Amino acid sequence: MPVSVDLEGLEGLSRTERIEFLRRRIRSSPARVADAPAPAAPVTLTATAPAPDPAPARVRPVLPVPEALSALLPEGGLARGTVVSVSGAGSLLLGILASVTGSGRHAAVIGLPRLGLLAASEMGAHLQRVALVPDPGPDPVEVAAVLLDGIDLVVLGLGGMSVPPSRARAVVARARNKGATLIVTDGRWDGAELRLDARIRGYGGLGSGARTGHGRVRAVHLGVEVQGRAVRPRTGRLTLTSTGDGVEWGSADSAVSHQDPVLEALPS
C-alpha cells in the first residue's frame, strides 16, 4: 500500500515546522537507488601509446519510463535533476510512475487525490514505494520542494494554478542540486525541460471481426508528443494492452486502430 502523508493536522504549525515534519518523513524512508555507474578501472599508457580520444560528453542519469515511451525521449528516460511537464491522458503519468517504482525507486504524489493507483498497479507500480500527499495545503509547491530532498520522483498536481517564473526557477535549481526529477501536471509551469502530452487516439478489441474482444476494450492507443528546450518535437503512437493479469505498453505504429468519439470523450 502507498504511504499517505496527511498534512491536515499541521495547520497550526509554522512553515518551518511543517517543512521539518516532511523532512523527518523523508529520512524514515529507504535511500534512493544509486544511478551512478561504477568507476572505470585505471588505464596505464606507455610512452609510445597514442593520445586517448577526448572524453565523451557526460551522460546524465535518468529515471526509467515505459520502454515504448523511451524511444521518444532524447535521453531514453527522465533526466535526474530536471522538471518535466505532463498533460493529457493520465495513463502516461501512471506508466511513468509504474516504471520508476517498479525499478526499486521511490516516488511522491502531491495534490492528486483521484490518481488511478489501481491502474498504476496493473502497469507494474510498487505502491509501497509511493508516498501520497492528497491535500498539500495552500502551498503545494513548497511541499514538492521539500520532498525533492530524498525522493527520486516527485509528481506535483498544480490544481490549475500558474507558478511564477521566479518560483519555478528556484524549484528547478533545487531539483538539479538534489538529483531528483519533478513532474508537474494540471497547471502552468514555465521552464520545464521536457513537455509530454498524451491524447487518446483510438481503441482495439471490441466487437469487430469474429467478435474480437467480445465487446470489451482490450487496447487503448495514445498519440504522444514530446517537446522541450533544445529538443526537436517528436510524436509517436503508443498502445496500452490488457494482458489478463496486467497492462503492457507497446508501440501502436503498426497496429490497426480507428477513432471512437465515445472513447475520446472519456476523462483522462
Q: Where are the regions a protein language model picked out?
A:
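Detector for small/aliphatic-rich hydrophobic stretches
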Residues: 1-84, 89-90, 94-102, 106-109, ...
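Signal for well-folded cores of large energy- and translation-related assemblies
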Residues: 73-74, 98-101, 148-149, 159, ...
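Short glycine-/polar-rich loops that comprise or flank the Walker A/P-loop
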Residues: 105, 127-128, 150-151, 177-180, ...
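Long, charge-dense
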Residues: 106-164, 168, 173
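Glycine-rich, charge-decorated loop segments at or immediately adjacent to ligand/cofactor-binding or catalytic sites
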Residues: 119-122, 189-202
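A generic local secondary-structure boundary/capping motif
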Residues: 144-145, 171-172, 183, 208-214
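C-terminal functional extensions of proteins
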Residues: 199-268
